[in-house]
Amino acid sequence: MERCVRVKSWVEENRASFQPPVCNKLMHREQLKIMFVGGPNTRKDYHIEEGEEVFYQLEGDMVLRVLEQGEHRDVVIRQGEIFLLPARVPHSPQRFANTMGLVIERRRMETELDGLRYYVGDTEDVLFEKWFHCKDLGTQLAPIIQEFFHSEQYRTGKPNPDQLLKEPPFPLSTRSVMEPMSLKAWLESHSRELQAGTSLSLFGDSYETQVIAHGQGSSKGPRQDVDVWLWQLEGSSKVTMGGQCVALAPDDSLLVPAGFSYMWERAQGSVALSVTQDPACKKPLG
């Protein structure tokens, strides 16, 4: 049986890991990657992946620089706000001192590639890029960044066409990027439905990511090919899995590994989230 992890306590215990130059630490590294990221860390590179990313700011604000439909823009994610980044959107996180954010992404499929790009100023022109199968982003990015800093492209600010792909592995997304929203305000506005036993999706069904808010009641999580991350925000609940039971108090979290079914009983006044990212639900290109 997986043990529950109290989020804020875990962050405090690992506070030293969130200082430069590393700035991040994984709570879970299975099919779901549950990562917490500190700062400061300002970047010029843009990351591109075929999956989606969930951002939530626990402490302070951050800026996520994105290339959206051909235009560079800054998405400000403030403390307490949650945000879902669509797949195939170039993005560059800008983090500041004394901040802490949660990032959730998934293990890549064997057929998927990640990209790291530098652009010429605020244009769509690619200055430098590398494409790779991502197994450990924390260790794979640093050598690519160092390669760029020692490159002729960095020195001259001009791309080398011979080192750029004629066609990228996949087209960039044409979706509009949503605005971040206050998680607390969203939950409060739906409290009546949640406490009546209705579970609600924060982002709808047009993404492979499902962030579901749950109030009081019980539900059975079927055996899935993906992990499920549970985060108890208010009240209490009880999870039974593999014949064992674990109690969740406010701010406790629990990872249900792929291949396990579970029963989740939530007491009156309970508010909790469940998060899944299923690549089998990848949406058509767009």
UniProtKB/Swiss-Prot annotation:
UniProt-listed CDD domains: cupin_HAO (cd06123)
Pfam family of the protein (one): 3-HAO
UniProt pathway: Cofactor biosynthesis; NAD(+) biosynthesis; quinolinate from L-kynurenine: step 3/3
Residue positions binding O2: R43
Region annotation (Domain A (catalytic)) ranges: 1-160
Binding site for Fe cation: H47, E53, H91
Region Linker: start-end pairs: 161-177
Any one GO molecular function term: oxygen binding
Domain of life assignment: Eukaryota
GO cellular component: cytoplasm; cytosol; mitochondrial membrane
GO annotation (BP), single: response to zinc ion
Summary of subunit composition and partner proteins: Monomer.
Recorded family membership: Belongs to the 3-HAO family.
Protein name as catalogued: 3-hydroxyanthranilate 3,4-dioxygenase
UniProt gene name: Haao
